[in-house]
A protein has these predicted regions:
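Structural beta-alpha unit
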Residues: 1, 14, 50-53, 57, ...
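General small-molecule cofactor/ligand-binding pocket signal
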Residues: 34-36, 78-82, 131, 173-175, ...
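Short, structured interface segments
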Residues: 118-136
Length: 280
């Protein structure tokens, strides 16, 4: 896997936090950074050329200010500014990257339904792990949360989260969520106690197996285990509200909790509680 960290830069305030996050990781792991900024909305309208030239120049100047901060930290950096579709360009760029870092309000400021839509689509399409950074100060928070469901992609998420927790000197908080089967006529949500007990036990076993190899690679890592009944995205965001980082998989095939981008992972990104990595 490439060591290159690609960073999506926009004019949104969150871009400063995005670049700062990437710098911190690059310094510790001696990784190069490529700053990418894409001017979208090109339609080929009459008179558009002059507007596009100005937009590209202004964007290049903006990105260069961030590049100066990267250089000041002693990190190798390259700058890439172009016109195009941000989702397509960053997705293509991810093919040569080890990590892609973007801001949560990639489409700009606001709080409507479109907020974060580009980030969700990029996380779904990128070929490398994607880190989505919210415009929130997480400096006083602690812990790295990871969603665990026993699937293959969940194993990748656990490995990524454990490495980050070790790097940051933070505890790894493993969260597994189970949800009782939904029956149309079970409106009162009444379930046999034996069933609930067995669901809890089965999920605990799945989590234990998923975490079994952590101590070998990270012998000094503190691991906190949480197995909770509930809805996965709600539980994950609740736990992550106090964490420095959360890690989820792009999809899952486990019977306990499926982290499907477009469902659970999408909901996590749409209501971002902290810096969140989506791993495939």
């Amino acid at each position: 896997m490439s060591d290159l960290i690609i960073v999506g830069v926009t004019g949104a305030p969150v871009s400063t936090r995005v670049v700062d996050w990437a710098i911190a990781r690059a310094v510790e792991r001696r990784q190069p950074i490529a700053l990418h900024s894409i001017v979208g909305g090109v339609l080929g309208a009459v008179g558009e050329d002059a507007v596009l030239v100005h937009a590209l120049e202004a964007t290049r100047a903006l990105v260069e200010t961030h590049a100066q901060r990267v250089r000041a930290a002693g990190v190798e950096v390259s700058v890439h500014v172009e016109a195009g579709n941000p989702i397509a360009v960053l997705t293509k760029a991810s093919e040569s990257a080890g990590l892609l870092v973007i801001g949560s309000d990639y489409r700009g400021p606001g709080s409507g339904k479109a907020r974060g839509a580009h980030g969700i689509r990029i996380a779904a399409a990128a070929t490398c792990p994607v880190v989505v950074v919210p415009d929130v100060d997480t400096g006083e928070r602690h812990g790295v949360v990871v969603g665990v469901d026993g699937s293959e992609v969940s194993e990748q998420a656990v490995r990524f989260a454990a490495a980050e927790a070790d790097r940051l000197g933070e505890p790894l908080i493993a969260v597994s969520v189970w949800t009782p089967l939904q029956a149309p006529r079970n409106d009162l949500a009444v379930y046999p106690e034996l069933y609930l007990t067995n669901m809890q036990a089965a999920t605990e076993e799945i989590q234990a197996l998923a975490l079994a190899g952590i101590a070998v690679d990270h012998p000094d890592l503190e691991v906190v285990r949480r197995v909770v009944r509930g809805y996965p995205s709600h539980v994950l965001n609740e736990v992550a509200a106090d964490a420095r980082l959360m890690v989820v998989g792009t999809h899952g095939r486990g019977a306990i909790a499926r982290f499907l981008l477009g469902s659970i992972s999408q909901e996590v990104l749409a209501h971002l509680a902290t810096v969140t990595a989506v791993v495939r």
